[in-house]
């Protein structure tokens, strides 16, 4: 027990590193925020062949929308190929084939591909589309644009991204900024959008302009096919195949470009259970990428020590969640130790202001009413802490296993504030993590009570925030599990499924 205060202090300092990281990225962003990357001149006759890949798995609500969107891209039809990489086991396949046939009749080269076996999940599908599809279905493009099933790219997407490759022979990947079709659907979606805007507006721009390693976000981007091949291709040993490949490409000497002025609209999940599933997948995959790439990063002769340190902080960012759980669990025993005076959280101090500053800057950059949008921050903070337990389990899986099950995030064709999800067979329900979250909320309340009784008043706010956070996430999960079916909502979506976005 004598080591417990030391361990607690070290964990608090470790958490402070992630807060400091936000300040570093904000500083880099502010230095470079006025730098603009203009789109090179476009000579339509010189545009190269492009293959669009859209991996799909049981997405009957949105599959027709994404096919319509990519078929409407402004690009020479004789140099545009669309692969719908369909691993679905439900009605999605029929809908996709019918919509693809509709566009083929209008001269668009769009094909729905079914591989013999669903191996490697998304990474396996992308690799199969590039390397194993044969005949007319084989990928023909020199450049590969990727969109998940819930994306709805704007018609000029390729014209604003592909020309950059023609002027930079070592450019391997272009990532664009995500925007959101259903940002204002609910408080949960507004909170997620605030977090994602912070990543895309400040973090990605800071990493790119600061000469740091940056990530591909899995969709809304374009790759040079030669870069994919020379960097080892898509690999399924991590659940973040996008993060893995983008780091391997940069370690191999390829350059990446981030274009904040080009946006790719997509959907964010309305369910807290879906958000937790998504975050768990990213947590597990990021830790697997850390295990896989930490050695090559440290040995790289291309990177300075500052770049290496920032890369490791980036890959390890989800370790913050088990650290948060450990801080909470250690606090109560510390309070009960004889002759122990107080628990200090001074290591978090000002650095805890890093994330909210980052979010505020992102909203100020994007929206005139940024102050109103920052009202989502309290809920985001509660959710960010409240998912710590489910992400802790995911981090543990990432530390002891390679690969894993790619549990998709269900999407429901929600646009603006319209649409519904309660009648869908894809809706998720609360799981065993909810029970643990309730237990952790009660544990945090007990810690606050003991802190009051022992005179450690500085621990009380910390404990109450944890109690509120775990209680919020558990409560949202239970409320959405018990939400009644609305009736007719899915029929309305299906009838309108062919509408262009």
Regions found by a protein language model. Give the residues of each.
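Long helical/loop segments within the catalytic core of UDP-sugar-dependent glycosyltransferases
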Residues: 100-143, 155-239, 251, 272-316
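Donor nucleotide-sugar recognition loop
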Residues: 229-247, 256, 263-264
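Membrane-embedded multi-pass helical conduit in multi-pass membrane proteins
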Residues: 13, 29-31, 42-44, 314-405, ...
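A conserved acidic beta->alpha catalytic loop
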Residues: 76, 86-96, 116-119
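Short, acidic, metal-binding catalytic loop of nucleotide-sugar glycosyltransferases
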Residues: 68-79
């Amino acid at each position: 027990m004598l080591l417990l205060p030391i361990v607690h202090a070290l964990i608090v300092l470790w958490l402070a590193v992630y807060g400091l990281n936000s300040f570093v990225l904000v500083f880099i962003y502010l230095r470079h925020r006025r730098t603009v990357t203009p789109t090179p001149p476009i000579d339509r006759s010189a545009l190269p062949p492009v293959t669009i890949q859209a991996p799909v798995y049981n997405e009957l609500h949105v599959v027709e929308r994404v096919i319509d969107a990519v078929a409407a891209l402004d690009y020479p039809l004789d140099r545009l190929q669309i692969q719908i990489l369909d691993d679905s086991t439900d009605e999605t396949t029929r809908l996709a084939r019918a919509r693809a046939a509709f566009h083929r009749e209008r001269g668009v080269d769009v094909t729905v591909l079914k591989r013999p076996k669903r191996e490697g999940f998304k990474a396996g599908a992308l690799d199969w589309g590039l390397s194993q599809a044969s005949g007319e279905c084989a990928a023909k493009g020199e450049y590969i644009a990727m969109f998940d099933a819930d994306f709805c790219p704007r018609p000029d997407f390729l014209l604003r991204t592909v020309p950059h490759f023609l002027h930079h022979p070592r450019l391997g990947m272009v990532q664009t900024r995500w925007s959101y079709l259903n940002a204002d659907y609910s408080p949960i979606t507004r909170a997620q959008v605030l977090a994602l805007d912070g990543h895309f507006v400040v973090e990605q721009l800071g990493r790119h302009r600061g000469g740091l390693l940056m990530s591909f976000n899995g969709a809304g981007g374009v790759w040079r096919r030669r870069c994919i091949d020379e960097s080892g291709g898509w690999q399924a040993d991590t659940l973040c195949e996008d993060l893995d490949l983008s780091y391997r490409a940069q370690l191999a000497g390829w350059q990446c470009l981030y274009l904040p002025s080009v946006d790719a609209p997509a959907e964010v999940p309305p369910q807290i259970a879906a958000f937790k599933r998504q975050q768990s997948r990213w947590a597990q995959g990021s830790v697997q990428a850390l295990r896989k790439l930490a050695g090559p990063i440290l040995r790289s002769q291309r990177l300075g020590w500052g770049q290496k340190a920032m890369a490791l902080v980036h890959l390890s960012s989800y370790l913050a969640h088990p650290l948060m759980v450990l801080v909470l669990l250690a606090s109560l025993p510390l309070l009960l130790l004889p002759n122990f005076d107080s628990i200090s959280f001074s290591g978090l101090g000002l650095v805890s202001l890093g994330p909210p500053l980052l979010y505020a800057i992102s909203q100020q950059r994007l929206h005139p009413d940024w102050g109103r949008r920052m009202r989502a921050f309290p809920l985001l903070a509660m959710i960010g802490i409240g998912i710590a337990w489910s992400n802790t389990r995911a981090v543990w899986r990432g530390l002891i296993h390679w690969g894993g099950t790619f549990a998709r995030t269900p999407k429901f064709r929600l646009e603006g504030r319209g649409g519904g999800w309660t009648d869908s067979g894809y809706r998720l329900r609360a799981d065993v993590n909810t029970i643990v979250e309730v237990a952790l909320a009660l544990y945090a309340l007990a810690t606050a009570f003991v802190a009051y009784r022992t005179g450690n008043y500085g621990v009380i706010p910390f404990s109450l925030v944890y109690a509120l956070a775990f209680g919020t996430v558990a409560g949202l999960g239970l409320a959405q599990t018990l939400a009644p079916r609305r009736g007719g909502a899915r029929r309305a979506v299906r009838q309108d499924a062919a509408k262009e976005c």
